Amino acid sequence: KILTGYTYKNSFKKWSFNYQGLMNLSSLSFNTVQGWNLDSGFSYRKWNDENGKYTSITSTFNYGFAEERLRIKGNYYHRFNNQNNAYISLSGGSSINQFNNSEPISNTINTVSTLFFKNNFMKLYNKEFAEINYGREVTNGIFVSGRVIYENRRALFNNTDYTLIKNDDAYFSNDPLQPNNYTSTPFQKHHIIKGQIGTRIRFGQKYISRPDGKINIQNDDYPVLSLSYEKAFAGTNKNYQYDFIGAVVDYSKTIGNKGDFRLRFKAGKFFNADNISFVDYKHFNGNQTHVNMMNNSLNAFNLLPYYSHSTNDAYLETHIEHNFKGYIMNKIPLLNKLQWNLIGGFHQINVPNFKPYQEVTVGFDNIGWGKFRFLRIDYVRSYQNGFQGEGVMFGLKF
């Protein structure tokens, strides 16, 4: 059990315990900072179906073999009820993180890209942190949340050149701005405190009240609006302090038998941020691997380098997609037997000092056989002050 892990569940008293084991091979991955690395940890969960209370306590141990470094972090989460979904969470410890905290490249994809193609796209830094979050629905359709986080950040270097292929190419450095810079760091070691408040508004939301909770019913005639304000203060260097406001609009609508229409607009603006740490820039979810395992077509780009358009100013991000379902394909003899769905999309970034970056996509979803339809394929063309490039994106859904 020490090596393989252990799980115990008491359904009568409604609690469970899990230990992942020292050989948690499902977490095994590779990057050029840590080399081979894996996770272990413990988790305890307790729940009450009658009033919606839920508590979890988790710990994660991550060890990088080339770095010879153990990182430990923990999290406490408690949901008070199923009526307004009020919750509080506390977390802290040491972790290794991508510069883009949305983590646009997964551990699995980065492992394959690095070991087989020497494309080490994942760029990482270290942080020790402590964080508290609280949120609740204040009235029907309006959810408010806030958090305060302390971070002590440190840049990292590559610690291995191990690969499964043999050629003369060298790995890029761990600097997202200067991939051929192996001697200096993209930022100086520093600490900072950040406070954030946000709200999510679901216009026209209806609900059903039950003794065991509130069931929300979203009205697809209206968009969902999210607003946020963030302030960074108490930094090692005053230049790292800034203010930021952001907004996200999400909308999805089924248009009769003509398919599903979806869009997402994201906008934001930094203030007093001329010399902030690159960690705090707005980073866009790019992709240079031609593989997407996250099913996040409204939150990512297909051919965009990961940090080419990062900004500490203003930005507008646009994603539009229409899935025709069977509306077109079902009208084409023979092809209708495939049960594929035609999809078209448009994606754009607007940031100062750059021409708009755009992607136009067309592809097929629901590719596979029987109940196993896990593949999506898109043909992508990118434009910025003219045609930039083209490629094929493979989307995997498991």
Language-model segment annotations:
Residues 1-34, 41, 104-255, 343-345:
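Transmembrane beta-strand segments of outer-membrane beta-barrel domains in Gram-negative
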Residues 17-30, 46, 52-78, 90, ...:
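Transmembrane beta-strand segments that form the barrel wall of outer-membrane beta-barrel proteins
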Residues 34-38, 68-72, 126-130, 189-195, ...:
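Residues that define the transmembrane beta-barrel architecture of outer-membrane proteins
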Residues 48-55, 82-88, 141-144, 154, ...:
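Repeated loop/turn-to-beta-strand initiation elements of outer-membrane beta-barrel proteins
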Residues 71-74, 101-106, 156-163, 210-215, ...:
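Outer-membrane beta-barrel translocator domains and adjoining extracellular loop/strand segments
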